[in-house]
Amino acid sequence: MTQLNVVNDINHAGNWLIRNQELLLSYIINLISSIIILIIGFFAAKIISNLINKVLITQKIDTTIANFLAALVRYIIITFALIASLGCIGVQTTSVIAILGAAGMAIGLALQGSLSNFAAGVLLVILRPFRTGEYVNLEKISGTVLNIHVFYTTFRTLDGKIVVIPNGKIISGNIINYSREKARRNEFIIGVSYDSDIDKVIKILKNVVKNEKRVLKDRDIIVGLSELAPSSLNFIVRCWSHTDDINIVYWDLMVKFKKALDSNNINIPYPQFDINLKKKY
C-alpha cells in the first residue's frame, strides 16, 4: 500500500505539473527577470555613483559632499531596482512605495534641521557664492572660507577665530564676497577747512592718487566736492586697485593725502560749534 501511495502521489504531482506548466514557466521567467534587474541595478548604481564622484571631485567640490551625493544616488538607484524586482515576482509595489514614503516622511520630520542644512550645503556647492580661500561677509561675521562641509561651513576671522556656521543660516542671509572680483574700488572722504581753494584741493588729491603705482590707471579716478558739512568741505575720492592690495592701498593713500595737504598749508578742521551767550540785565 505504501508503494502504491507513493506512485499515486508522483502521478498526481506529474499531472499537476503538466496542467500548470505554463504558470510555472511564467513564475520561473519572472524570478529570473527579478534577479537580472537586481544585478543590473547594483552594477548601474556602482558605476553611476563612481562616475558622479569623479566628476564632482574634478570640479573641485568638497570630497565629503562629493562622496555623500554619490552614495545618495547609489542608494536611490538600488531602491528603484529593488521595487522593480519585487514587481516582477508579483509583489504589490504600491504598498512598498507607500511604506517607503511614510518612513521617509518620518525621518524627514525627525531630521528637519539637518536636512535643511544639507540642502543648503548642496546649493552652496552648485551656486558657489564663495569658494575656499575667499573673504566674505555674512551680515554678522566676516572671514576667510576654510572648508565647505555637508552641513556646515568654517571661517577664520581677521583676529584668528574659527567660526562654524550651519549652511541653512548662510544660504538664508545676504552674502558679500570681497575676493571674487580681481579689482575693487576704494572710497575716501577728505575734509578740509572752508577757506581752502577747492580747485587746488582737487588737484592735490588727484596727483596723490595718480602717483600711487598700485592704483589701476585704466579705471576711473574720481575726485570731487561731495558735501558742505557743518565744519568742513568734504571731498570724495574714488579709485580702483587689485583686490589683494585694497587695504594696504587705502592705508597708504590716507597717509599720503594728509602729508600732501599739510605741505600745501591746507588745514583739516576739527568739528566746530558756535556758542552764543546771552547776558541778562
Curated annotation (Swiss-Prot):
One of its GO terms (molecular function) is mechanosensitive monoatomic ion channel activity. It is found in: Cell membrane. It comes from the Bacteria. PROSITE patterns: UPF0003 (PS01246). Its main location: membrane. Gene3D superfamilies: 1.10.287.1260, 2.30.30.60, 3.30.70.100. The keyword Membrane applies. It is a multi-pass membrane protein. The keyword Membrane applies. Keywords: Cell membrane, Membrane, Transmembrane, Transmembrane helix. Belongs to the MscS (TC 1.A.23) family. This is Uncharacterized MscS family protein bbp_402. It comes from Buchnera aphidicola subsp. Baizongia pistaciae (strain Bp).
